[in-house]
Regions:
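Acidic, metal/cofactor-coordinating or nucleic-acid-engaging core segments within structured domains
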Residues: 202-208
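Nucleotide/phosphate-binding catalytic cleft detector across ATP-hydrolyzing
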Residues: 1-164, 181-196, 208, 216-314
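Conserved blade-register residue in beta-propeller folds
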Residues: 26, 174-176
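Ser/Thr-glycine-rich phosphate-binding loops at phosphate-binding pockets of nucleotides
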Residues: 167-173
């Protein structure tokens, strides 16, 4: 979150938000991108958001994959929660907010305008989150290519020919960056993320051991490489995750990845799969484990845009 004065001398709060299928991320916060809607006030209210007369439990479960993030109200409600978390971190509950967000690389051209309108559907909004009232006015919304934003602070490192893989919960975005310049015609989006890995592991457990294991356990092994479970279960999960990670590298090779000819940069929450289960030359592959890197990049790009238009940080 960055406080700025725009060229009209208005104070605006820039908040970068990464609308993931698995997690919502801001520059300083990360929470599951699940929404459960209730007509009446629910019993448990730890992450309750009240908006427009409805009750929403935030972070109950992951958001299912959808080709368009504007197809329901979930991401709007999650956006309000993300804004509230950032404002609360600064002891604020009122602001004029400029959203910096993004979409998968190959979706930006066709969905950018609709997503921008979706985020700005209200000029101002009053809502309650975790028993605290918020009053937000919207100053604007910028939409950037997902993945590329995560490299914003380190573009100078992209000398020569490079491939960027942004592995999220629902998609993997692939981009070529040559001599610090992204190649627009070399951008691809694959439906190949950590959620699909969980499904593959779940199927292996059922096939090999006839057992259903909670997704939270599977996700922990994917994220950390281990969990407090029996060795036979751990072995099957690791094997399935390793096989899935090999498929990720196969997808990259289909997009002309050759480790001897280009460096690979891996970002996003799914980068843990590469780190924990991948077979690769560590001198040729860089893994960026900051799950908030993309949100930070969105935020930084909007700050730069406002500065170029005569604004300044305050």
């Amino acid at each position: 979150m960055r406080m700025m004065k725009n060229n009209n001398n208005e104070t605006v709060t820039v908040i970068g938000i990464d609308h993931g299928y698995g997690n919502m991320k801001t520059a300083t916060r990360c929470f599951p991108s699940g929404v459960a809607r209730y007509d009446k006030e629910p019993i448990f209210q730890n992450n309750l958001l009240v908006y427009n007369g409805m009750y929403y439990q935030i972070g109950e479960e992951h958001k299912e994959f959808c080709a368009e993030k504007t197809q329901d109200e979930d991401y709007y409600v999650l956006t309000l929660a993300a804004i509230a978390k950032e404002l609360d971190g600064k002891g604020m509950n009122r602001a004029k907010v400029h959203i910096a967000a993004g979409l998968p690389l190959t979706w930006v051209a066709t969905q950018k305008e609709d997503f921008q309108k979706y985020l700005l559907q209200n000029e101002r909004v009053d809502f309650t989150f975790r028993n605290k009232e918020y009053h937000v006015e919207f100053a604007g919304a910028d939409i950037y290519p997902q993945g590329f934003a995560a490299t914003f602070y380190r573009l100078q490192d992209f000398k020569g020919i490079n491939m960027l893989a942004d592995i999220g919960n629902g998609t993997m975005n692939i981009m070529y960056i040559n001599n610090s310049r992204p190649l627009e015609k070399k951008c691809f989006t694959e439906k190949y993320g950590t959620h699909q890995c969980v499904l593959a592991v779940r199927e292996s457990l059922l096939k090999e051991l006839g057992t259903v294991v909670d997704d939270l356990v599977i996700e922990q092994v994917i994220r950390t490489g281990t969990a407090d479970i029996g060795e036979k279960y751990l072995t099957v999960i690791r094997k399935a995750a390793g096989d899935y990670t090999k498929e990720i590298f196969h997808k990259l090779r289909e997009r002309e990845y050759n480790p001897e000819l280009r460096r690979l940069y891996v970002v996003g929450g799914g980068s843990c799969m590469i780190q924990n289960f991948g077979e690769y030359d560590k001198s040729r592959v860089t893994i960026v484990r900051d799950i908030c890197a993309t949100a930070k990049g969105y935020e930084a790009m909007t700050v730069r845009k406002i500065q170029r238009n005569g604004g300044m940080l305050v």
